[in-house]
UniProtKB/Swiss-Prot annotation:
UniProt-listed GO biological process terms: ribosomal small subunit biogenesis; rRNA processing; translation
Record keywords, A-Z: Ribonucleoprotein, Ribosomal protein
Molecular function terms from GO: structural constituent of ribosome
GO cellular component, one term: cytosolic small ribosomal subunit
Protein's name in the database: Small ribosomal subunit protein eS7
Gene: rps7
Native organism taxonomy: Eukaryota, Amoebozoa, Evosea, Eumycetozoa, Dictyostelia
PANTHER family in UniProt: 40S RIBOSOMAL PROTEIN S7 (PTHR11278), SMALL RIBOSOMAL SUBUNIT PROTEIN ES7 (PTHR11278:SF0)
Superkingdom field: Eukaryota
Family the entry assigns: Belongs to the eukaryotic ribosomal protein eS7 family.
One family name in Pfam for this protein: Ribosomal_S7e
Amino acid sequence: MLNKKIIKPAGKVATEFENTVAQALVDLENNNAELKDLKDLSVCSVKEVDVAESKKAVVIFVPFRQLKNYNKIQQKLTYEVEKKLGGKQVMFIAQRRIIRKPASNNKIKMQKRPISRTIKAVHDAILDDLVFPNTIVGRRLRYRLDGSKLHKIYLDRKEMLSNISKVDSFSAVYHKLTGKEVVFEFTQQTAEN
């Protein structure tokens, strides 16, 4: 049953931690009536990211075509998987591939690169998957005096109470996956007349 839950490329073997997460998903699929939709869903890989000295986050990569199905049950599924993994924060991200920019000196004609496979599109999609079900309402790119960049991401204030504890995890996971430094903030409440 675990072999069907984890999809790996030929020749790759699932790690012990990936098997643990897959077993947790199988248990939830069998025991929880609300999560019966998990039967058709699978996992590509699982990574564990250090957030702070004692905090860890778990990133579960799912096939791109199954992301919408995961999103339908994601809030309940995240809560249940976090309980099974001992309180580690869980995030679901679609497995995407970046195709590099074709070199100008390449004599062989290459296939055109789709916009969805560019590095910017993939990094933006990872960001959207990371903060789901919250929505990103604004982005700012700040250039520091030393030349480094800081991305400021503004999240919707409606989901602030449920996501305020996850903001550190969001930035640590995004930095680990993309190498970009990110700060998440919630929008300011404006006075309505």
